[in-house]
Amino acid sequence: MDTATQPVIVLGSGPVGLGVALLLAQSGRAVTVYEAKDELALSDANSYPIGVNPRGQETLRRIDSALLDRLREHGEIVRGWRIFAGGRLVAKLASGTVWSTTRAFVNKILLEKAEADPHLTLVTGHKLARVDVAARRLVFTLSSGEETTVDAAGARVIAADGVWSATRRSLIGQVPGFDPEVGPWGVRFRVLFSKPGAKAPGLDPSLHYIFGDKGMYSATLASEVWCVAVTAIEGTEDEPLLLATEATDANVAALQEFVRQAAPLTAPLLTREDYVDFFGRDSFTGAVIRCPFVNVGEWLVLIGDAAHGVIPPTGEGVNSGLEDALLLTEHLNSGSATPFSDYNAARMPDLAALGEYAWFLMENVRSTDPARRTANVVWRIAGVLGKPLGLKAGQVEERLFGPAADRTPYRAILAPWIRQKDRVFPVLHALARAGFGLARKLRRRPPATREPA
């Protein structure tokens, strides 16, 4: 079958699945997208903030430049970041290349585009149960609970079914050598949303703020709606409150106090009603995924979180997935007889580098070790300051989100960081452990007593 006209099955209708479906439909291919949910309820209120950097923007532009116009109407340009530790401003990062929005909004504008595309069919209520690699069949569970099987032998299958990908799980044991690493985040993120036009002394809506002590993050959307994201780390004393689902007076008061202590600059943004609404919102978790390869011959390929789940502090979740969609489409349209293998060979060095970066950040985010968390703050400050400290390899954030950010391959950006991290971070961690150990000894030492005169 001609690879340029071969039908395509896409699993998953998130931003990555719809992105690749729309790109492939441009060439007249018949594309069918299978989605587990009966209906996609896409609202900012039950989503989370993301920044769309030049990687994600380029994919949206290639699909339709009007999508970028929608993004700019709804979002806010991020002029930069401010990083706080212990209530003190410790680092600044300039940007001007990233647009602030929510994952739900990006998904929404892509879905609206997909629903109007005559070459694209969206099939809802089909949750992938398993993949039969030998028979080239896909087995779905319908909303009714019944199973149905789709013969996909004559199609190319693109699995964009997310971090908990049923496709990826199915390949284990069926595909020799396929043994992905799955590292659960160990945290859940949940978001407070302000009323439109909210303001607070010391906060600039063109800036995003990171409060390192408790892993809090604030960002703005259109109409100066502020998002204040909190991090519930498994096993910590804050976790029950941050995951509570009842807006009791006690919970609301405790959450208000938590925000005042952890991110005091954001407290004036939020009303009591904003705190009440928080307890009715979803929380989000995930995992860092590292696969040894992402294709099964020329029949199936994994992209997005199914292939390389990251963690929000990377800023690359949706962006890297949208870039997958664009690069995979270029290989499929190249005329090569082996586009999936070509994509795998070209993309894996970048995914390996991104995976190592994400794994490191995951271990820091979920750590309850104060020494590691202190070392991480120091390492992150060094990464932002970079040049003045002679740590050019630490400037990952600047190259991903700074004023000159572009689509430089991840391997080129992250290789120097990986080399330096392997040398420097263990030293920082050891020094922090020693410092905390000394502090504990001093606290235990009995006070000196004086002999009576």
Identify the function of each model-found stretch.
Residues 10-26, 37, 158-159, 192, ...:
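Conserved mid-domain beta->alpha element of the FAD-binding
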Residues 70-74, 121, 260-279, 336-344, ...:
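Acidic/histidine metal-binding catalytic segments
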Residues 38-59:
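Conserved N-terminal glycine-rich FAD pyrophosphate-binding loop of Rossmann-like flavoproteins
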Residues 25-45:
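Glycine-rich FAD pyrophosphate-binding loop
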Residues 4-5, 268-269, 330-453:
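C-terminal helical "tail/cap" subdomain of flavin- and related membrane-associated enzymes
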Residues 112, 117, 126-130, 135-283, ...:
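Conserved FAD-binding catalytic core of PHBH/FMO-like flavoproteins
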Residues 2-8, 25, 53-191, 406-413, ...:
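Conserved N-terminal helical subregion
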